[in-house]
UniProtKB/Swiss-Prot annotation:
The active site is at C53 (cysteine sulfenic acid (-soh) intermediate). The active site is a conserved redox-active cysteine residue, the peroxidatic cysteine (C(P)), which makes the nucleophilic attack on the peroxide substrate. The peroxide oxidizes the C(P)-SH to cysteine sulfenic acid (C(P)-SOH), which then reacts with another cysteine residue, the resolving cysteine (C(R)), to form a disulfide bridge. The disulfide is subsequently reduced by an appropriate electron donor to complete the catalytic cycle. In this typical 2-Cys peroxiredoxin, C(R) is provided by the other dimeric subunit to form an intersubunit disulfide. InterPro entries: AhpC/TSA, Peroxiredoxin, Peroxiredoxin_AhpC-typ, Peroxiredoxin_C, Thioredoxin-like_sf, Thioredoxin_domain. Residues 8-166 form the Thioredoxin domain. GO terms for cellular component: cytosol. Gene3D superfamilies: Glutaredoxin. The lineage of its organism: Eukaryota, Metazoa, Ecdysozoa, Nematoda, Chromadorea. The keyword Transcription does not apply. This is Peroxiredoxin 2. It comes from Brugia malayi (Filarial nematode worm).
Length: 199
């Protein structure tokens, strides 16, 4: 895998885009800019009508209420057409389809979005399993890219967002395996000792 041509960097503005998506069984124009002011989870996946992909997209879609409670928008994106997306949404889940979706499914057949985010598998023209967390100011806070056979975790994505939001609000930092309610660290040489003395 190569990140050549990627414009996605931690701490920098996420590459903007505008494209057609399947939303509530219809076609709609979606842009990243319209979500300014809230966190965004952007999921790239390889192909419609495959095997791991529906398990991931359905998992995120079915738990959208938890993301909405945190004021987070979730979107999935592949290099398939919006017509392919719609056919997949209209396919029963027992037949490998998506069924009713609570998140937009973005289409971008010319590869511009997946290339900008550094997830395009150039030899096949499909996207690796990239997951990007973008903050309310449009800044990238988290990037993970999986190879094709391994899916991603909704629980870990929610945990990361909760950690970023805690830092935004309180200015303290979150140690390994932090969950809401766990101890955090005051970022300073002297201040951090209070945490380290307990652990």
């Amino acid at each position: 895998m190569t990140l050549a041509g990627s414009k996605a960097f931690i701490g920098q503005p996420a590459p903007n885009f505008k494209t057609t998506a399947v939303v509530n069984g219809d076609f709609k124009e979606i842009s990243l800019g319209q979500f300014k002011g809230k966190y965004v989870v952007l999921l790239f996946y390889p192909l419609d009508f495959t095997f791991v992909c529906p398990t991931e997209i359905i998992a995120f879609s079915d738990r959208i209420a938890e993301f909405k409670q945190l004021d987070v928008a979730v979107m999935a994106c592949s290099t398939d057409s919006h017509f392919s997306h719609l056919a997949w949404v209209n396919t029963d889940r027992k037949m490998g389809g998506l069924g009713q979706m609570n998140i937009p499914i973005l289409a971008y057949t010319n590869h511009v979005i997946s290339r900008a985010y550094g997830v395009l598998k150039e030899d096949d023209g499909i996207a690796y399993r990239g997951l990007f967390i973008i903050d309310p100011k449009g800044i990238l806070g988290q990037i993970t890219i999986n190879d094709l056979p391994v899916g991603r975790s909704v629980d870990e994505t929610l945990r990361l967002i909760q950690a970023f939001q805690f830092v935004d609000k309180h200015g303290e930092v979150c140690p390994a395996n932090w969950h809401p309610g766990s101890e955090t660290i005051k970022p300073g040489v002297k201040e951090s000792k209070a945490y380290f003395e307990k652990h």
